[in-house]
């Protein structure tokens, strides 16, 4: 069999159509497929003429009228995006110097926006009312938190062993031996550090406690009259003048899962009858060439199966500027002016049509809302770790989300996905300038969502959480190490954001959001320092002789004291703050029904197991987050390349590599404390033994087999597992379908396979006008690639080839026309098997 016959056999067409094609050479085949009978100056450009025919062979249902167009050079091109209508979107430079801002105000140059002027009188009154209520509520929260912290800190001071604070006079130590002075001061310096850290950490815990408590009351009693969800009935028709874009920025994601969730979401939107009000944009920043080709294939299949031509678009950026935020900004500049709203989706997001329509209705009912964040529910994972986290977020999450809404109202959080945004003010106010300066906290902003919410609020637009709007879903990391990789990015981003704490015009609530974002990770090293100082104090107490006389001519000694009853009382009250939100959560479930959680006994047992699990993981996260914070401040780059895992499980080798130092620290800490004082080891036991067990917990919790076993036992059961909503059922069904027809080694198939080459050629975006310089560059790229083995062709060079329709056509022609010359490519491709279902429907392929 010659190569021409093999080439024809690779086409997904009937035998009669194959027989009609010429068998003489590859060029003749392309000429026969070219309905326009074009002539090409170069022989290896002939595949460009057959692109349309090859696309129609493989994806006939994806090529509606107008889907295939001509570029400026007459080459066939898939119209994957609508015509751009550009808008101006540029950032204002950050001004973080409060002295400079004060000087501007003195000179009358303060340009703080007067946003209320755009509202009607009735809207202004409503706006002022909830803002006043929100301010009062937050003052109450501040008073409660600080009062609780002051009482607890004073209580902590009374139970520390060294109580000679008032007798220490530095002037009395002048002329005294330095070592004696140091030993006198050391216990009190340690205790001072302990008290300061205790106050900060207790304040942090207290704020969370009051947030959960108010969320509990909110959910138990019913709606707050200031809830944004109360502003609509829920069945109002959508305004046809206000169109919404569903945008999904992706980067090297699981293609099968991305398009399964997106299809389920779109099918749900169609079921509402409101699909005409929505468009979908898949905004790819992927830089893995194999994934890029797989995305193109999945997009073609998606628009064919849902009839999405003209409504579902795909674009891959060649210049990945500013990561996700830059991708969204790029969409806004090119197509944002065509839409009133946009809903940002993550790669794992799934939303029901009712939820999306509900968000649009809320936007239309609240003309001063800039961002409305839904409350996504976690579901869809099977590992023990993920199921435990899903259960925790499903049980405790509603309390904290409702509590956040209670305290913040329309000056709330935006989490970067599953939220609707008013496009015009976003374009005008939410472009992000890079942070000035040098170092690890300068440059492009990493955690863009909090900053965009702060800028939206600074411009006078509300940022709300629709915490009681159902139908919003996401997925969690499958194991601890994957979660920590994500935390590494979030930690750095939140630390960077704190530089904006003093930026001009930021609302106090969003300054507090920046502070809480930092504390989410800074609390870890603070907790570690608290434990270290407590241990050091115990070492001093055990190994040194107490200083009974701190002043000259002191009549009575100062005895170190130990008051275990007070220590236990303080410990118990702190535990109440930590664990009462969990108890309130389970009380709420007991009151409203436990059936969807497996019943009374199973949900209670699941709660106890989750508490144990969180106790085991807290010290592990503490140490990792401490490393993340320190590395960010020191400018260290933490390299974390985890191996690919088919079942999302952590291997023993990787676990001991990541957790080995923690295990060693736990052993040394435990042995040292046992040697010094067994009683103190009792207090440290939850921490040191968690560190010792960390590799074992990490591995076992990452196993899907263990997670599925708990699912069969109805432990960690959530409503989405007990009675899955249709959109999640569809996601699983589409995911299985996509996996059956998945495409691996996409770049090599785009070079060799006639159908995938046509797809890559038609979707290539580097469509320059002809020039001699460009032709020389193209020939150089093609020759250099073919003169090397495919294994040596790196990612960036593959992307350059994949982005140019001419280079893809020439590569395709040469490997088929001269297989002997490019034998290394041919032999490499022969070792790759194309999924037989990749080019046709599974039922058709099996016939």
Curated annotation (Swiss-Prot):
Pathways involved: Glycan metabolism; osmoregulated periplasmic glucan (OPG) biosynthesis
Short name of any one Pfam family annotated for the protein: Glycos_transf_2
Membrane topology: Multi-pass membrane protein
Periplasmic compartment spans: 161-193, 534-569, 626-679
Cytoplasmic domain ranges by topology: 1-139, 215-512, 591-602, 701-847
Any one GO cellular component localisation term in the record: plasma membrane
HAMAP family the UniProt entry points to: MdoH_OpgH
Function: Involved in the biosynthesis of osmoregulated periplasmic glucans (OPGs).
Protein name in the entry: Glucans biosynthesis glucosyltransferase H
Organism: Escherichia coli (strain K12)
Protein encoded by which gene: mdoH
């Amino acid at each position: 069999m010659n190569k021409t016959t093999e080439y024809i056999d690779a086409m997904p067409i009937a035998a009669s159509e194959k027989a009609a094609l010429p068998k003489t050479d590859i060029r003749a085949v392309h000429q026969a497929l070219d309905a326009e009978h074009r002539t090409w100056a170069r022989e290896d450009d002939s595949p460009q003429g057959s692109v349309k025919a090859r696309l129609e062979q493989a994806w006939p249902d994806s090529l509606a009228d107008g889907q295939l167009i001509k570029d400026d050079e007459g080459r066939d091109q898939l119209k994957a995006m609508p015509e751009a209508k550009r808008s101006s979107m540029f950032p204002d430079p950050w001004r973080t110097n409060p002295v400079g801002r004060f000087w501007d105000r003195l000179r009358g140059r303060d340009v703080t926006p007067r946003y209320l002027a755009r509202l009607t009188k009735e809207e202004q009154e409503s706006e002022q009312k909830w803002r006043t209520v929100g301010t009062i509520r937050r003052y109450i929260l501040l008073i409660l938190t600080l009062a609780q912290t002051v009482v607890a800190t004073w209580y902590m001071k009374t139970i520390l062993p060294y109580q000679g604070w008032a007798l220490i006079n530095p002037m009395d130590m002048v002329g005294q031996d330095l070592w004696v002075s140091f030993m006198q001061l050391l216990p009190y310096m340690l205790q001072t550090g302990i008290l300061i850290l205790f106050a900060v950490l207790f304040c942090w815990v207290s704020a969370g406690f009051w947030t959960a408590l108010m969320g509990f009351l909110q959910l138990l009693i019913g709606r707050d009259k200031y809830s944004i969800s109360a502003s609509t009935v829920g069945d109002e028709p959508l305004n046809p003048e206000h169109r919404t874009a569903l945008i999904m920025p992706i980067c090297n994601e699981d293609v099968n899962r991305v398009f399964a969730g997106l299809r389920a979401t779109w099918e749900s939107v169609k079921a509402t009858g409101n699909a005409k009000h929505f468009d979908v944009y898949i905004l790819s920043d992927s830089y893995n060439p194999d994934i890029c080709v797989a995305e193109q294939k999945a997009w073609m299949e998606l628009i064919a199966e849902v009839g999405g031509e003209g409504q579902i678009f795909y674009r891959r950026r060649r210049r990945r500027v500013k990561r996700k935020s830059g991708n969204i900004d790029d969409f806004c500049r090119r197509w944002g002016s065509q839409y009133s709203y946009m809903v940002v989706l993550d790669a794992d997001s799934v939303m029901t049509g009712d939820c999306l329509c509900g968000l649009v209705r809320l936007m239309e009912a609240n003309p001063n809302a800039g961002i409305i964040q839904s409350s996504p529910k976690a579901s869809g994972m099977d590992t023990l770790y993920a199921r435990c986290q899903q259960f925790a977020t499903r049980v405790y999450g509603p309390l904290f989300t409702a509590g956040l809404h209670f305290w913040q109202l329309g000056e709330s959080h935006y989490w970067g996905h599953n939220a609707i945004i008013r496009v015009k003010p976003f374009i005008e106010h939410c472009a992000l300038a890079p942070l000035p300066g040098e170092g690890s906290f300068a440059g492009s902003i990493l955690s863009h969502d909090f900053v965009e919410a702060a800028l939206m609020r600074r411009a006078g637009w509300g940022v709300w959480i629709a915490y009681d709007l159902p139908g919003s879903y996401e997925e969690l990391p499958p194991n601890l190490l994957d979660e920590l990789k994500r935390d590494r990015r979030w930690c750095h981003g939140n630390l960077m954001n704190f530089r904006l704490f003093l930026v001009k015009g930021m609302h106090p609530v969003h300054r507090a959001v920046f502070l809480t974002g930092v504390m989410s990770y800074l609390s870890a090293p603070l907790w570690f320092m608290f434990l270290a100082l407590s241990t050091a104090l115990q070492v001093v107490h055990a190994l040194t002789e107490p200083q009974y006389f701190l002043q000259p001519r002191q009549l009575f000694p100062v005895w170190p004291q130990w008051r275990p009853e007070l220590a236990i009382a303080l410990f118990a009250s702190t535990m109440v703050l930590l664990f009462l939100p969990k108890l309130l959560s389970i009380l709420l479930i007991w009151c409203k029904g436990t059936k969807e959680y497996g019943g009374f006994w199973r949900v209670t047992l699941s709660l106890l197991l989750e508490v144990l699990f969180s106790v085991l993981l807290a010290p592990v996260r503490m140490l990792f987050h401490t490393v993340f914070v320190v590395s960010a401040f020191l400018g260290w780059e933490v390299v974390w390349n985890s191996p690919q895992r088919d079942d999302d499980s952590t291997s023993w080798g990787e676990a001991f590599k990541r957790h080995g130092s923690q295990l060693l620290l736990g052993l040394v800490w435990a042995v040292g404390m046992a040697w010094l004082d067994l009683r103190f080891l009792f207090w440290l036991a939850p921490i040191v033994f968690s560190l010792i067990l960390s590799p074992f917990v990490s591995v076992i919790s990452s196993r899907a087999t263990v997670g599925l076993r708990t699912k069969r036992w109805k432990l960690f059961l959530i409503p989405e597992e007990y009675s899955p909503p249709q959109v999640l059922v569809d996601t699983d069904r589409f995911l299985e379908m996509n996996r059956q027809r998945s495409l691996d080694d996409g770049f090599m198939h785009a070079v060799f396979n006639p159908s995938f080459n046509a797809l890559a050629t038609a979707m290539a975006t580097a469509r320059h006008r002809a020039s001699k310089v460009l032709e020389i560059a193209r020939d150089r790229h093609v020759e250099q690639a073919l003169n090397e083995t495919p294994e040596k062709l790196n990612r960036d060079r593959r992307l350059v080839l994949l982005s140019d329709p001419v280079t893809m056509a020439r590569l395709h022609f040469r490997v088929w026309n001269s297989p002997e010359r490019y034998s290394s490519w041919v032999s490499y491709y022969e070792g790759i098997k194309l999924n037989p279902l990749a080019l046709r429907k599974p039922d058709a392929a099996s016939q």
